[in-house]
Amino acid sequence: MPKYDSHLKCSFCGKSQEQVRKLIAGPGVYICDECVELCNDILDEELLDVPPASTGERDGTGQKQKKSGQPRRRLTLEELPKPTAIKQYLDEYVIGQDEAKKVLSVAVYNHYKRLNLLERNQEIDPGDAVELQKSNILLVGPTGSGKTLLAQTLAKILEVPFAVADATTLTEAGYVGEDVENILLRLLQVADLDVEEAQRGIIYIDEIDKIARKSENPSITRDVSGEGVQQALLKMLEGTVANVPPQGGRKHPYQDCIQIDTSNILFICGGAFVGLEKVIEQRFGKKSMGFVRPGEGPSKEKRTADVLRQAEPDDLVKFGLIPEFIGRIPVMACLNPLDEDALIAILTQPRNAIVKQYQTLLGMDHVELDFQPDAVRAIATEAHRRKTGARALRGIVEELMLDVMYELPSREDLTHCLITREMVEKRSTAELLLHPSSLPKPESA
């Protein structure tokens, strides 16, 4: 027989340890299993009565969410943003990549028209109406070329829900990782749990090349994060009614699922596809032959981009994507690698350019910040050497500005900062703090 302490009682109902199955101790208090169960019932009832959270703020992708209880505004055919207007907006934030911008602009415009036609067909006899099928998109480009930024910029102007997902976290059902239905869950959350709105949305799946199978031939072993994920995505890309767990499927296996029809959801996939150019060159039987002087001809990155534009479905199959998956993404656009001139433009021209961001930061401390043209080019040269595209720019500028950003809030005698090429090469702006009364001047050649 277990021994009970008759002095121990539940602090809520007053029952002794002998009268309950379990008594849980806390700092000076106790609670029995019956009270715990009662609290769970109360919380469940409260959660059922609470409407979805409404913030009216922008979500993680930068898209403004609709307020709870208010339907998202539907654009008429005359109000639809034209492809040229969409591209002009993308030009304000993303440098270059005109081909990819045109592909995305046309795809988004056609997506709007498909939704508009569906609404009109519901008002007439649907049997006589023409159905417009969606054309999912594949973006191919090196790291840091702007694939994700294009998607995030699109999210700012769209009147339909837009979600961004990462393919590297996905695994086949039953294994550690995320189910493919979690992609739809992100879109559902952006739509404020409005199923009808989510079914009109757009999903961008990043790093899609990371789910390529390890070899061209089908494997006899289980590839849970490669071919298995591609198989799971097939019906979702084409159009199916998917069961989406609103709290995530792995931790809450017994919850009620929400059904979402993906037939009208536009999918945009992006990836670097490192090594695809070698597969294409093997198809053409091309080898690097002859002698080329350094500096002559296009750069290696430019040659790679030119080769990728000749990619065919068979090349993607050899890379590791299954034919069924490729067939559901009929449109492909290639992004150009960024050269030094493009990196300079990224530093200075976009609305959210890095130089403008730091000028705003220092301006809040009443300090004027200027970059000499040679300094900007030196930053771009170093970023190009690191071969990580535009992502390298912020790291270089952060390292460069560390000393000034650290000392500046405590210095009232510093009112002007001029960044020179020498400072960029030294990766330090410490000398600015030594002589704040005079502007540093570049050494004469």
From Swiss-Prot:
> Which GO biological-process labels does this protein carry?
cell division; proteolysis involved in protein catabolic process
Task: Report keywords, A-Z.
Answer: ATP-binding, Chaperone, Metal-binding, Nucleotide-binding, Zinc
Describe the location of the ClpX-type ZB domain by residue ranges. 1-51
Region Disordered: what ranges? 50-77
Q: GO CC annotations?
A: HslUV protease complex
Q: Which residues does Zn(2+) bind?
A: C10, C13, C32, C35
Q: Indicate, by first and last residue, each region the UniProt record lists as having compositional bias (Basic residues).
A: 64-74
For ATP, which residues are the binding ones? P142, T143, G144, S145, G146, K147, T148, L149
Q: Which InterPro entries match?
A: AAA+_ATPase, ATP-dep_Clp_protease_ClpX, ATPase_AAA_core, Clp_ATPase_C, Clp_protease_ATP-bd_su_ClpX, ClpX_bact, P-loop_NTPase, Znf_CppX_C4
Tell me the superkingdom of the source: Bacteria
Q: Does the keyword Metal-binding apply?
A: yes
Q: What does this protein do?
A: ATP-dependent specificity component of the Clp protease. It directs the protease to specific substrates. Can perform chaperone functions in the absence of ClpP.
Give the UniProt family note: Belongs to the ClpX chaperone family.
Q: How does it assemble?
A: Component of the ClpX-ClpP complex. Forms a hexameric ring that, in the presence of ATP, binds to fourteen ClpP subunits assembled into a disk-like structure with a central cavity, resembling the structure of eukaryotic proteasomes.
Q: What is this protein called?
A: ATP-dependent Clp protease ATP-binding subunit ClpX
What is the species of this protein?
Answer: Synechocystis sp. (strain ATCC 27184 / PCC 6803 / Kazusa)
